[in-house]
């Protein structure tokens, strides 16, 4: 008589731990964990071609990611542009944004910037001009520049990090802000660190050719 397979009885065998879905597939604890949203900036190097920004913004809107600002501008290479996105998402959402951006054909490289990255914004404010001396004093205090001054309105610009811009706007409220235009963040990695790996690789190739 043939003996059966050796080993413990089914009820005595070790069972995989963790929850499973209706199909019996184990649920990854990391995906189930509750992650608090955090605010961060992503820098993407993209090909300078028509429609790239539309593809990126369309991807973000379809996935319903919480994006706070998006800026774009050319780099030292006229064939590429830098897109800086500020998002507020839980950790899995941030990683998902990175993955989805990397899948866009025209995106060359994308990475999350560290907390020490250099970030700057610009705000243009038009305020009532009844107290020009006080307006000028506030402008000077924030290292700003007067762009236009007339008997009824004064327009100034301020550049700086997010906190400085927020503080400046609050300071100008006493005069009555008629209009305001604020850019999103643009950012670069600090020191000798490259903002994207693709830029570092391109620089190294040019050095070899020289």
Please name every model-derived segment:
Residues 2-45, 49-81, 86-210:
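Long, contiguous binding/interaction regions
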């Amino acid at each position: 008589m043939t003996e059966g397979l050796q080993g413990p009885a089914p009820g005595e065998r070790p069972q995989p731990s963790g929850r499973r879905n209706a199909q019996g597939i184990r649920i990854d604890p990391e995906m189930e964990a509750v992650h608090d949203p955090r605010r961060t900036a992503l820098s993407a190097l993209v090909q300078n071609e028509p429609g790239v920004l539309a593809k990126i913004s369309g991807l973000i809107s379809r996935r319903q990611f919480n994006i706070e600002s998006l800026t774009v501008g050319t780099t030292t290479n006229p064939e590429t542009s830098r897109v800086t996105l500020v998002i507020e998402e839980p950790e899995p959402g941030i990683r998902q944004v990175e993955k989805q951006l990397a899948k866009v054909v025209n995106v060359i490289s994308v990475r999350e910037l560290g907390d020490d990255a250099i970030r700057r914004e610009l705000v243009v404010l038009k305020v009532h001009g009844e107290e020009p001396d006080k307006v000028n004093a506030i402008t000077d205090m924030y290292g700003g520049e007067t762009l236009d001054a007339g008997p009824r309105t004064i327009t100034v610009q301020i550049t700086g990090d997010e906190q400085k811009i927020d503080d400046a706007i609050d300071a100008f409220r006493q005069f009555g802000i008629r209009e305001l235009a604020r850019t999103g963040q643009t950012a670069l990695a600090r020191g000798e660190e490259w903002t994207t790996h693709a830029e570092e690789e391109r620089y190294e190739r040019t050095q070899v050719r020289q």
